[in-house]
Amino acid sequence: CLFFLPASAQKKDKCNETEFRAKKQAYMAKKAHLTQEETEKFFPLYFEFQDKKKEINKGAWGNAKKGIKPETSEEQYEEIIDNYFDEQERIARLEKEYIKRYREILSNKKIYMLYWAEIKFSRNMLKILQEIDDTKNKGL
């Protein structure tokens, strides 16, 4: 996966979702100091939540793409925006449900540390993708 490769090797490695999740899991578990047992119990729930969130977002993006068309009306933009925030509320409710389930496995401190690790992982991925984009734009 991109996150774990030097810039020169990134183009050669196409990371599939399973590999990406494994690396994300390892990174987050390490940063949150999870035990093997905690890791085995937590991450199936975490990825279950991620899958549900992905499905909700897929619907939101489908609606948002309608706004790309130049003939989109103000009423349609209003609907797109309202749908987007409805989807975000659905995700927030779902996440609260999963937090309750996480608390059956982990302390609040470890849940916090996992969320922080997830943010750092995402930021690192964005930096790497930006570096790749910058390299492509320089013609290298």
Features from the language model and the residues they span:
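Small-side-chain structural scaffolding
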Residues: 7-9, 32, 39, 117
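Residues in flexible loops and secondary-structure boundaries
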Residues: 3, 36, 40-42, 114, ...
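Amphipathic, charged alpha-helical segments and their helix-to-coil junctions
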Residues: 48, 92, 96-140
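Short N-terminal segments immediately surrounding and downstream of signal-peptide cleavage
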Residues: 11-28
